[in-house]
């Protein structure tokens, strides 16, 4: 402290929230946790800020002991505080402490703590209660779960149903000819289907083509042949017109 200039030492005395670090090169604000270079211009600019002015008015001499025994110094990190009600770490600065203590979680935990003190019951933080419930649920759910019934197709033998290989339900009944073509519906016909050879035998013989039908077919063929010849002739003409030999270059020259 004696190594600092007189104006810097006087300025730090006016602002007790600014603490000089051990290396005497930086200044730390206990209200916001900011670190500043130990120079008078930077310190003056910082103290004129709105945030610093608001915190100074709210807590001119901030005392962390007011929030004990609920908020105590952290054993893991000396620059942080620990809340026993919510089991959370807080930065060691008034702004963060005030924000935490004014929050819903802390206020709810504080009310629960006061109720437990009146009833003479030990207070257990809410997060620990949730953890215990999860562990109990996991312990209860460790047993083997009943497996769902595996789906099995119904057997084809039940109720005299047709086998799965039968494909009669996929095609119309007209495609399957029966052996008892000549028998009536009341007759004792069998349900077996005809084979390919039997199907050909069962078909009626084709009628012979008449003379008139033959004449019509010959006339039709003649017309088709004539049309084909006409089309070929027109195509040949077009091909010749497009593939004519170019005139020789000498014939294009004008006589001298």
From Swiss-Prot:
Region (Disordered): 133-256
Compositional bias per record (Low complexity), positions renumbered to this chain: 156-165
Bias (Acidic residues): 183-193
UniProt GO cellular component terms: nuclear speck; nucleolus; nucleoplasm; plasma membrane
UniProt biased composition (Basic residues): 224-247
Residues recorded as bearing Phosphothreonine in the entry: 190, 195
Top-rank taxon: Eukaryota
Compositionally biased tracts (Basic and acidic residues): 135-150, 194-218
InterPro entries (alphabetical): Surf2
Keywords, comma-separated and alphabetical: Phosphoprotein
Ion transport recorded as keyword: no
Keyword Phosphoprotein: yes
Family: Belongs to the SURF2 family.
Entry protein name: Surfeit locus protein 2
Species of the source: Homo sapiens (Human)
Lineage start: Eukaryota, Metazoa, Chordata, Craniata, Vertebrata
